[in-house]
Regions:
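Short loop/turn segments that flank or connect secondary-structure elements
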Residues: 1-26, 33-41, 45-79, 83-88, ...
């Protein structure tokens, strides 16, 4: 059987690969770099801008993806908005986890973490052939050199925030009494949110809620990303309790549940997850409590 060229190659910490960067900037062109709120805040601070101003200038979809609309480079692909041909990344010290990891990826299932690269052939060989002439590194040494620990802590902490937001959507549906009454309006809306284009999902979230999710209004503690995420979630939780705790009317509960689900899915996309797959899992849970499509 011929291996699937699009499948992932999973790696061991001791796997040795041509991971010494050529500094050619190839990987700063034509990519999709999703960022979480901690990363957005770090990038804004490194740029000397407020978070909202930086997100408007350098990001898409409310601040969860970096813009790649700079001058064309390798294969005519556009550069990241933060890339400068004469000096490389303008915020290198604050670069997001996905940039630090590249060409590797990180996959987390519950508490198991695996590292991988896309395809059978090592990705850097096409755009940076000179990498063969540079020292090989083990995966473990590469990760240490890229200082991925803070970014991984932020990613994992925001995965927990995503789950808590989805739990809030489920609580509004289930504890609010809708699921037990066989509600058939909420789940189709959830399904639609999961299938929506990123722009459509942004439009489904009220602007004040979108800002609360993606533009946290406090300074970044780069040494403690987990605390940053915890403070951010506490703000979101307080807002949800203030607005939704006293709801009793069915339509209001439906709207609140869909709001929390939209927030969970939007954050999930920022973390590299598939909203469609995420919402399918949460719909299964809701159906066990009586909700219907």
């Amino acid at each position: 059987m011929v291996p699937d060229q699009h499948s992932n190659t999973y790696l061991e910490p001791s796997s040795s690969l041509p991971l010494t960067c050529t500094r050619a900037g190839t990987c700063c062109h034509g990519k999709m770099v999703w960022i979480n709120p901690w990363e957005l805040t770090r990038l804004a601070e490194a740029s000397g801008e407020g978070v909202a101003a930086f997100a408007e200038r350098c990001c898409e979809y409310g601040g969860i993806r970096l813009r790649f609309d700079g001058p064309p480079g390798w294969k005519g692909l556009p550069a990241c908005r933060l890339y400068a041909a004469e000096r490389g990344c303008s915020v290198h010290a604050a670069r997001p986890l996905s940039c630090r990891l590249y060409p590797l990826g990180r996959e987390r299932q519950v508490k198991t973490v695996r590292y991988l690269h896309q395809g059978i052939r090592f990705p850097c060989l096409e755009g940076c052939a000179d990498v063969r002439d540079l020292p090989a590194l083990t995966v473990q040494d590469y990760l240490v050199g890229q200082d991925v620990t803070p970014g991984e802590a932020a990613q994992d902490a925001y995965l927990e925030v995503m789950q808590e937001l989805a739990e809030a959507a489920l609580i509004l549906l289930i504890d609010g009494g809708l699921a037990g009454q066989g509600d058939h309006q909420v789940l189709p809306r959830w399904r639609g949110l999961g299938a929506a284009h990123p722009r459509g999902l942004v439009q489904a979230i009220a602007p004040d809620w979108l800002s609360a999710l993606t533009l946290p209004g406090f300074a970044c503690d780069s040494a403690d990303p987990a605390r940053f995420a915890a403070v951010h979630f506490a703000q979101l939780q307080e807002r949800a309790q203030r607005l939704f705790a006293s709801l009793r009317e069915a339509d209001a509960l439906r709207e609140a549940s869909c709001t929390m689900m939209a927030l969970a899915l939007h954050l999930g996309r920022a973390l590299g997850s598939s909203p469609d797959q995420l919402v399918h899992r949460w719909i299964i849970t809701a159906k066990k409590h009586g909700a219907r499509e």
